[in-house]
């Protein structure tokens, strides 16, 4: 038996299996992998099939400069999302002179990840830059791939989860390691429109070439030798 575990929880299912693939295997706050009693193979999210149908018109101008689809600190409703709240509050405070969106659109949580919300998609397709941030205690979030599939430039915090065909900094997206670096990246790409558009397009095409559901299945099959 093969287990492919995409749950947020860090604990493993107590089952006897040949291979165990786990998404949330990183202890994000300490920048290391969790210690398990068995071999665990990290696996990442991907572009879900529902998100493959959007035609991206790169000649069309986007009217939202920056979007952050997280709650601010003042709107906290659950634990473990402090980093996201800090990022949302930072963008809301320091880029209020720009046309920005900060906050949840449609439904968040599991329901939001399982369904494609039309208002959310509309905001993505209108956004020049989308800032993403992993949860406090693990890595891996569908928003990264949802944003890539809509052709926005992604700014995301640095990750250590290994990936087949990884996204390269400033080629497919941009990584940040602090709020100061995030602010600098935002200012740079808003001032360099052509580079922003090209990087966003690279990320979109790369995601659809190497990070679809079928690609994750191929990665699993390669490990198990089929």
PLM features per residue range, with description:
Residues 173-179, 189-193:
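Conserved acidic donor-binding segment of nucleotide-sugar-dependent glycosyltransferases
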Residues 119, 181, 185:
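Short acidic active-site motifs
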Residues 1-146, 150-169, 214, 218:
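Nucleotide-sugar donor-binding catalytic core of glycosyltransferases
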Residues 122, 187-188, 205:
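Surface-exposed charged/polar residues within alpha-helices that form helix-capping/stabilizing sites
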Residues 90-93, 188, 223:
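A generic secondary-structure signal
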Residues 194-224:
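A charged, aromatic-enriched C-terminal amphipathic alpha-helix characteristic of glycosyltransferases
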């Amino acid at each position: 038996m093969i287990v492919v575990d995409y749950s947020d929880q860090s604990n493993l299912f107590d089952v006897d299996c040949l291979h165990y693939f786990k998404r949330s295997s990183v202890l994000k706050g300490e920048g290391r992998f969790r210690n398990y009693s068995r071999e665990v193979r990290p696996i990442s999210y991907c572009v879900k099939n529902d998100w493959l149908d959007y035609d991206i018109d790169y000649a069309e101008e986007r009217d939202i400069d920056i979007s952050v689809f997280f709650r601010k600190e003042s709107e906290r409703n659950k634990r473990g999302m402090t980093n996201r709240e800090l990022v949302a509050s930072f963008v809301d405070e320091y880029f209020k002179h720009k046309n920005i969106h900060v906050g949840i659109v449609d439904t968040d949580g599991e329901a939001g990840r399982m369904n494609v919300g039309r208002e959310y998609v509309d905001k993505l397709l209108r956004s020049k830059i989308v800032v993403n941030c992993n949860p406090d205690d693990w890595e891996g979030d569908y928003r990264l791939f949802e944003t890539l599939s809509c052709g926005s430039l992604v700014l995301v915090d640095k990750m250590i989860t290994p990936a087949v065909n990884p996204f390269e900094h400033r080629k497919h997206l941009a990584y940040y390691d602090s709020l100061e670096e995030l602010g600098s990246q935002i200012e740079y790409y808003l001032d360099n429109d052509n580079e922003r558009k090209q990087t966003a397009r690279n990320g979109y095409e790369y995601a659809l070439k190497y990070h679809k559901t079928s690609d994750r299945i191929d990665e699993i099959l390669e490990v198990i030798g089929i």
